[in-house]
Amino acid sequence: AMPRIVGIGHQDFEQMITSDNFYIDKTMFIKEWWENNDTVTLITRPRRFGKTLNLSMTEHFFSVKHSGRDDLFQNLSIWQEEKYRELQGTYPVIFLSFAGVKETSFPDARKSICQIIENLYNKYDFLLESDHLNEREKKAYKNVSADMDHNLAANSLNTLSDYLMRYYGKKVILLLDEYDT
């Protein structure tokens, strides 16, 4: 067998697990975080500490987008917990990174953030086909763009979470990375 590689700077959990890199199992973070039942958890660690990889792991664990991906977790400690096997892939998860926002002026940074939000909304276009949104909401949904007005931007994540909650009938897990940009 090939020797395992120590991967440095990996940020995507699936890539980390499937590429046979050496991975320090941090999946019990999922249990600890879930059982804390906090409304908001702030994870502050120094640079290069693996925060993004941890968020990616959390997203892969909970997101409906990754339902049925037992293969990513079956050799990790979280999989020993019967209760958590049932939770894998059963929640709507919004994973948003502001890592790309490097603009120095407020208007430019704002536009960049609004663009990230527009891209996020584009991923959930299926909501427009559903009957969970009324016509007014669908119209507002389509107005989310890089140059949307301040009120629409300020409420956009809350609004999207609300739509996803209606669609899936479950609370939304919102993961923000590089929020301090």
Residue ranges of predicted features:
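Walker A/P-loop-proximal flanking segment of P-loop NTPase domains
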Residues: 2-80
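P-loop NTPase motor core
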Residues: 9, 14, 60-127
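Phosphate/oxyanion-binding active-site loops and adjacent basic polyanion-contact surfaces
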Residues: 21-22, 105, 109, 113, ...
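Generic, well-ordered alpha-helical scaffold segments in large soluble proteins
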Residues: 32-36, 61, 116-120, 160-167
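Loop/turn-to-beta-strand initiation segments
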Residues: 39, 92, 169-173
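Structural preference for long, well-ordered alpha-helical segments in enzyme cores
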Residues: 54-58, 113, 160
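Mid-core helix/loop region of P-loop NTP-binding domains shared across ATPases and GTPases
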Residues: 123-175
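Walker B catalytic acidic pair
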Residues: 177-181
